[in-house]
Regions:
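Core subunits and conserved enzymes of cellular information-processing
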Residues: 3-242
Length: 242
């Protein structure tokens, strides 16, 4: 009887150990999956922004604002995107009413490859000749750039490991003030870049990266993010919301 009881205890212990190992492996698999999703979203975001900049038929508004302000100043596009990111991080801290170092570090980590890749991809796309395509195809590609950006935002907002500060701002506004309404949140977040573009135009009487794609982004980007939340990786839900 004692041997049978000890045997049962031993089997239960082994089962618990096996269950723990399996759970750990599942967690690791989940993290690998999230990492793949994150890399996919980063590439979508960089390619989408680079497309809109290269085609000059209208960028997403934050990128368009960076293009116009960099034209007014001697600052490169990559550096201007980085500066915008820092200013938005400060805004996010004010809205959250706290300094979340993990969140801020994540913002900076995201900005480095994003700013660099957009600055690199844009001239590469110009060099392959996409600006020589018929106007209709260029318009389609420009709108596709905005769609790619929306896909990217949807994915990495749900992962919520690290976000571009502008998309972190949109997520904060979306869930803090608008009960998850991505369309309203995006319109509010677009106000600062619109003001920056107006100021740039007043100084130079020139305007860049503003066109049909910008209008498309203004009208549809927020709504597209909400749509892609449901249809792109639908098993991926919003994580770690405050």
């Amino acid at each position: 009887m004692r041997l049978e009881f000890c045997d049962i205890i031993d089997r239960v212990s082994k089962w618990e150990e096996g269950f723990f190992v399996q759970a750990t492996q599942n967690k690791e698999l989940s993290n690998v999956r999230l990492l793949i999703y994150f890399i996919v979203s980063l590439m979508f975001n960089c390619l989408g922004n680079a497309l809109t900049v290269a085609l000059n038929l209208g960028s997403a508004l934050w990128t368009a604002a960076a293009v116009n302000i960099s034209d007014v100043t001697p600052v490169s596009l990559s550096m201007m995107l980085f500066i915008f990111g820092v200013l938005i991080i400060i805004t996010n801290v004010i809205l959250l009413n706290k300094i979340d170092l993990k969140r801020i570090i994540g913002n900076f980590i995201f900005m480095v490859p994003f700013s660099t890749l957009v600055g690199v991809f844009s001239p590469l796309l110009i060099n392959v000749g996409i600006t020589s395509l018929p106007l209709f195809l260029r318009i389609v590609l420009d709108c596709m750039g905005v769609v790619f950006i929306s896909v990217a935002i949807s994915i990495y907002q749900r992962i919520n490991w690290m976000l571009h500060p502008a998309d972190d701002l949109m997520q904060i506004v979306r869930f803090k003030f608008f009960k998850g309404n991505s369309s309203l949140a995006q319109l509010v977040v677009f106000m600062p870049p619109i003001i920056a573009i107006i100021v740039s135009y007043a100084l130079t009487h020139q305007i860049y990266a503003i066109n049909i794609g910008t209008v498309f982004a203004l009208l549809f980007q927020g709504g597209l993010v909400g749509v892609f939340d449901k249809i792109v990786f639908p098993d991926l839900k919003h994580r770690n919301l405050e």
